[in-house]
């Protein structure tokens, strides 16, 4: 497990792969992420990947306009991501997958320089309480 970084395109693109407890790993990051690909299987097979806490961490770490895509098309995932600020849509899937989800964060929460991570997280606590994915 752990964090695995791959630099591409003369180091102008940074790909960060996370292997482990997703909410804990995201909670330890400070970043401004432009694009997400969530490959965590369907909520029925990997429920830890699709929690309100994970959605809140994704929103906290996202830059304004951040794009997000995932193979799952589950309504609970779509609604959970929408509750933390993503505009999500069902799209045509890939291969045998009929539908998938894609979207973007309308506007990232701005924080003053030096703001502690715990204070940053509190901005999403209200959304976290509303979210009820399976």
Specify the residue positions occupied by each region the protein language model found.
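S-adenosyl-L-methionine
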Residues: 1-29
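Short glycine-rich, flexible loops that bind phosphorylated cofactors or substrates
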Residues: 44-45
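Short SAM/SAH-binding signature in class I
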Residues: 15-17, 31-40
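SAM-dependent transferase fold signal centered on methyltransferase-like domains
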Residues: 26, 58-60, 83-86
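Short beta->alpha linker loops
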Residues: 21, 72-73
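A short glycine-rich, Lys/Arg-flanked "PGG" loop and its adjoining helix->strand segment in the class I
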Residues: 48-65
